[in-house]
Amino acid sequence: MDYGLKDKVVLVTGSTKGLGKAIAELIAQEEGIPVVTGRREKEVHEIMMELREKYQDERIQGYCVDFSELSSVDFIFDVIKKDLGSIDVLINNAGIWPTAYVVDMKPEDFERTIRVNLEVPYLLCQKFVQEKIAAQQKGKIVNIVSQAAFHGSTTGHAHYAASKAGLVSFSISLAREVTKYGINVNMVAPGMVRTPMTEEALKAKPDYDNGRIPIGRVAEPEEVAQAAVFLASKCADYYTGITFDATGGMLMR
């Protein structure tokens, strides 16, 4: 299947490991131009060079960005514009998953979770649609949400669930606003995915999938990445405001 991603510039936030890295790799595999981002310069450089070498494409870029800082939004758009031109697809994947039950939760932890998981994606989406509308160009946004946005959390992640629920409502509202400009906004809702972010939790509860995931196992990053790449592609031109459940049956909505 031709996804129509050849030569498309795709910003993937949080893409040095886990799901984000898997998405960036699939974009490169489709001859798109992934923009790798992460907080650690060494990791960003290593992944960028790995993808450049594997897919023989020197256009693949990587930038060290801390998306807990609001200033990161203007920075990433400016450097991409300088090096590659405009962004064709925005994939908001960067996020944090701190653990704290509400009774013990610190306000600063709640605020940081909302900032990284909701406020910065809002600002990135805003900047993206402003530029696309001004240039009269079509575009695609894929926001990575979570099954917790729909079911809440039972494992000490109420702030995470709240941030992702907010991103769901925001994404649907944005889709209603910008579809007339040829901009599609969709979501992928993973369940538990085997990534560095979830590694400790899975070690602590090795039987997590027993009885919770009908398919009987946690997801590998590549499985969820396929959903994100589909929604980023021309194959999803008729889809907007939808949530692609990639939960192994946890949602079944």
Each predicted region: which residue ranges?
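Conserved glycine-rich cofactor-binding loop
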Residues: 16-17
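Active-site helix of classical SDR
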Residues: 125, 163, 171
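Short C-terminal tail/terminal secondary-structure segment
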Residues: 229, 240-253
